[in-house]
Amino acid sequence: MGDRRVAALRTGLGIQAVLTALAALILLAFPGIPSPPLYVSLAGFAMAGILIASNGISAYLKVFVSVYGVGYLLLAGSKTVAAMGLLPPVVAALLPPAFAATGAVVFAAIVLGISHLEPIRAITNIADPYFANRDKPTKEIGLFRWFGTTEGRIGRNLVALSIFVNFADVALTLRFNFFYRDIYNSLQEYDANAFWYQLLWVFVPLATLNIAIGMFDLFVDSSLLIRWRTWLTHSLYERWLGNGTHYRIPFTDEEADNPDQRIQ
């Protein structure tokens, strides 16, 4: 049992869990550091436990848990850095509220929980062959080849990047809600200085980020789709043509309804 725990800590998720627990401990142990609310720090320990418990789940779902763990660190850490005055006011104004970090922990817990459901396992059994494969990167596609040494690792990193981009988009949408509140408050109070500040120094950066994130998200998702379908096509052809499978099918008891035409 002890050996299993040590082995779990040596995995990528295990190392990430240790770093997350250390970050949460730092926020609690050093009162001189401007820290987020107590529940945000405690959520870090919960995140560490979720990361360790996720070692045995699907390779596809591990990506989600890992990204949410990184999201917690970024959100909690950025609010702490902003509280220390190390970020420009314009950047600090764009940050979501502190409780957004706990949202990442909740989503990670949901992913861990649903990973044990049979319908979800049926889906991940279809997705995992691509994300767990160790084949060399597809030569025909140059996009994101530097993301890993195997096609499976590239796929996992692209999924992680896509989730992170969507996570940023949700945080940006939340920040837009606070912008609407502040700018309408300035209109109600006839505060011209606050109005122009919100319009020029908050809305313009938010709108620019929103457009950039939307375009980048489309680029990442399209790249993942192309790479995944290319690998699936190669895998299907290899299984169909390898070891004379297509010759031996007529001599088995299994019925095949024009598989060659379906592949085409």
Predicted region positions:
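Short cytosolic helices in intracellular loops of multi-pass membrane proteins
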Residues: 229-248
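Short, well-ordered alpha-helical packing segments
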Residues: 181-188, 209, 213, 237, ...
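Alpha-helical transmembrane segments of multipass membrane proteins
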Residues: 169, 205-217, 234
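Membrane-integrated ABC transporters
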Residues: 1-203, 217-221, 225, 247-264
